[in-house]
């Protein structure tokens, strides 16, 4: 082992930490990180923790926000995701005994379109994917070493993956089932198989027991109602997309197809002209890894099955070939429709590529034809994932730039503190997601998190052909007064708004001057009092 390999092996943790800092360096500025599915909550208290309905990951995040501030927690959380992704890949490739292969795997788990998109928009899914990858690491080590400690760690990672995003349960189930069944074919030990399934299932149940119990006892109705309200229309709205003129089959093979990519909400990996060359080279490495390890490697064969099934399910209803399978699952498997965004299955493709590719690197570097250039080729292989998703560096630098809440929002908050009301405060425009000028992008509306629990705000999806899943009486009453895009105009009896709101115990209306706020000009015509107005907000008193 030469000095370069010794350095890479000795300081791998520092190197992956440096990579994480490089990717996230813009977040070191002051402010909050506003993302599509990450509610910015600057004033978290114990009252914001719902012990019977929040996953342990959410409870932990809120406790951390109380201890070190939400802004600091955001940075640590993102840094931890990227760092642990790198370490997971490095550890996954440890059986290769090749440090270049380990770096290829670690960098690939960080630099790929799937993780990039989720870090940019849905960091909880990125964190859940990291937990899924660590589940694979510990499960494979357990099967190789038969040490219970490894199984306990695998069970914990399985539980965390589900806690971060509940429908990863299907991904966990597929990965675990296929790998354990392949192991049973070799071991022929039913007791070992049953013990493994039991421990992994127990890990999922224990780490999610509180919100699962809350759902069964009716204490977690919002989570349950959201899933119950999903329909086949949701599957069509969140269908996996063909990106950049490629077929949907190749798009998913290249770890893309997330609907957010189609909307150009962040820099695409395809903006880099070398992305496809790098991907095809890594595809060759993965293929070589499969070929060289097929006969002797249980994980290789198991991951081929996992990859094939996950690829089909990730494409889902976007393909006339695979649509019948997805539609059958939506109709017959409980809660599968909750996985309305099938592209999440791509996480398992990422895992498979990292594993196979690392073995491809190992055997490429063992080839006598490159004996005089082994170090150079090894570094080139390490760099391939970075070239593949090179746009991720600039993309995250742009997308994760922090922003401050406007001073006008703080003025409104001070007004509410000085003129408190016992009832509710309706926040308009009525959107769950809105293009907020101070956030610089379309994000989940942070009104309740900023102004307090009295706020009633939009819970409507408004994506594709899906407007909302809310069926409660309060929401339906409010939505009588909301003009819905792409729907026929109807006469709205605005004069009934004050008595309807009073019946809901709404005493103030707060209108943010963003998006379609001018569609709410009728508030000035129905005889309610305007008590505050600035450049960002208007507050009305009923």
Predicted regions and their residues:
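Membrane-embedded helix bundles of polyisoprenyl
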Residues: 16-22, 83-92, 100-184, 196-216, ...
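Periplasmic/ER-lumenal interhelical loops and adjacent helix-loop junctions
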Residues: 42-44, 50-55, 201-203, 207-290, ...
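Extracytoplasmic
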Residues: 147, 217, 224-236, 265-269, ...
